[in-house]
Amino acid sequence: MTPQSQLTAAPPVVVIVDDDPAVRNSLQFSLELEGYAVRSYRNAAELLNAGELGPCNCYVIDQRMPGMSGMELIGQLRARRISTPAILIISQPNDVLSARAAQADIAIVEKPLLNNALVERIREACQHA
């Protein structure tokens, strides 16, 4: 290992939880191109049953998943004293969900994911992690 490589910081880690494999794979590919390390899970249960979750700078979680919603998953993470920033991706946010997310300091990015809205939110979250 060279002295220069010792100074290189590890990339920020983003965890994606989405039941749609096309969305999950697309997000992972895009974020890896942006320089993030990515771990992805098919649903809330898969993430919660993964054992030690390891370090993470940001969670990107789909709201509508079978078994447990994104907000419920974030609630489970908070109950485990995991305060890592979370971004909720959702097709049709309503006022009640938006208010709950704002109160819990959870960012919402609306689907379809256009331009760099999600990447910008992830950058912001990683700066505050």
Predicted regions and their residues:
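Acidic, metal-coordinating helix/loop segments flanking the phosphotransfer/catalytic sites
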Residues: 40-58
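Acidic catalytic/metal-coordinating carboxylates
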Residues: 42-43, 69-72
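Receiver (REC) domain active-site loop signature in two-component systems and cognate sites
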Residues: 65
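Short amphipathic alpha-helix used as the core "switch/output" element in two-component signaling
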Residues: 71-82
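Non-catalytic signal-transmission and effector/linker regions of two-component phosphorelay proteins
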Residues: 1-15, 21-22, 114-129
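Hydrophobic/aromatic residues positioned on beta-strands within the core alpha/beta folds
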Residues: 89-91
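Two-component/phosphorelay signaling modules centered on CheY-like receiver
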Residues: 21-39
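Active-site residues of response regulator receiver
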Residues: 62
